[in-house]
Amino acid sequence: MTDTVIHTESATSKYVNVVEDGTELRVHYNDTGTGNEALVLLHGSGPGATGWANFHRNVDAFANAGYRVILVDCPGWGKSDSIVCTGSRSDLNARVLAGVLDTLGIGRAHLVGNSMGGHSAVAFALSYPERVGKLVLMGGGTGGPSQFVPMPTEGIKLLQALYRDPTLENLKKMLNVFVYDASTMTEELMQTRLENMLGRRDHLENFVKSLTANPKQFPDYGHRLSEIKAPALVIWGRDDRFVPMDVGLRLVWNMPNADLHVFGRCGHWAQWEHAERFNRMVLEFLRR
């Protein structure tokens, strides 16, 4: 165990150039910790999302446990270049991640993905199985429909509405169903998220253009999940109003080496809502 260190976004902020379909993209990432094993954290698709915003309650625990922690801003989010995606968003993210790891000289990594990040981690595992250590998937991963909840879900409808009309009122509507306990969504947190969102209107506009060009940005990988042999920990919020819990069950049913943990009193953001328990659980899984 290394000494306890507090890691900051500004001190760990870096960039790398990656070529995607003939276009050079400037990709932002945070890189901290000095461990030999790399742990990549992949964020969700909400307006204003970034690697750091999604995982700031987890970085210290993982880095201080001896991992090199890399938080990637996917193209179209955070400080990375914007892009219009007309194909599979998750396969795009997987290719970009492979390029980032190539540039950093990292051959193999553990992946932790929330929502879109979970779906992108599955896409990466399908395309680059030899480069995956272990997988942790929260609130995303298959792209398939729920058997019990009409799609798109309440949360996804609010997310898409926020992209089209990025106001504080619409942000509050989305974040209030994002987590189980809406009182944890402080005014300060909402204001920071609003500033992140409005600071990159090109991201918002290009996401809407992407949806118009291809409404199915996240394909259904259900029929291929059995190909993923890497050990996987699937974590879900019982009260997730974005991606229902039965979608997570598909991962466990179809991936041969997957375990499942369900947090009660938890929405779509398990790594934030139950950060301490989540951190312990992930570290125990990685050390097996």
Curated annotation (Swiss-Prot):
The active site is at H268. It is an enzyme of class 3 (hydrolase). Gene3D superfamilies: alpha/beta hydrolase. InterPro entries: AB_hydrolase_1, AB_hydrolase_fold, Epox_hydrolase-like, MhpC_alpha/beta_hydrolase. SUPFAM superfamilies: alpha/beta-Hydrolases. It catalyses: (2Z,4E)-2-hydroxy-6-oxonona-2,4-dienedioate + H2O = (2Z)-2-hydroxypenta-2,4-dienoate + succinate + H(+); (2Z,4E,7E)-2-hydroxy-6-oxonona-2,4,7-trienedioate + H2O = (2Z)-2-hydroxypenta-2,4-dienoate + fumarate + H(+). Residues 38-274 form the AB hydrolase-1 domain. Belongs to the AB hydrolase superfamily. MhpC family. This is 2-hydroxy-6-oxononadienedioate/2-hydroxy-6-oxononatrienedioate hydrolase.
